[in-house]
């Protein structure tokens, strides 16, 4: 069972308004945790390692580092695929600095199941999910960007490789952007296949473009939901921190 006790991580709950609007949801027989963020109001960040190069891996070390700057996590989840040493597999941009380059070739595994894509937030807070080859051709200036794959929804269409009755069901998380610019983080709390997860993003969450992030190491930190999931170390972490003052 996933541990969801903030106290176990030494993370207190401050009396303040959450930056993310997070709710548990149910769609047919499947349960989800969904958080909606206005990227023009809240700063979505990517985190990987501290100043010494040590990968955070979990929410507690990241929160300890944020505390030194007067901040605390409000929302976070694993932010993309990574190598065994937890380096990002594809494009990774944090604070406007590219750490890893974009990968546009077809390859093994979910990441290489084209089309894959990039979640990008630019310097004025506009967020987009962009197909990887279109991203490479456009080369937008992103304040943060993370590449993953496959795309779940591409311009309103499900990824063509998804099979409705597939028995490959896992806990999964992903990110999408609505037509009004709001960013939607979603985590499946019951195992789902790609087709079901993508359909949920398109039809229920109303995101015409959405990106799969991970399907094995899937965890959520949500102050509003009282969750700080524990488990194996992660690579990139995506989310929102807020000031504790």
Predicted regions and their residues:
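Zymogen propeptides
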Residues: 17-110
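Conserved, well-ordered active-site substructure
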Residues: 89-105, 161, 165-173, 177-209, ...
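Active-site-adjacent helix-turn-beta-strand microarchitecture at beta-sheet edges
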Residues: 87-162
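Structural motif
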Residues: 73-75, 117-118, 126-128, 150-151, ...
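Short, solvent-exposed aromatic-acidic interface loops
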Residues: 49-52, 133-137, 187-191
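Bacterial N-terminal signal peptides
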Residues: 4-14
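Residues that act as N-cap/strand-start positions at coil-to-secondary-structure junctions
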Residues: 29, 113, 146, 169-171, ...
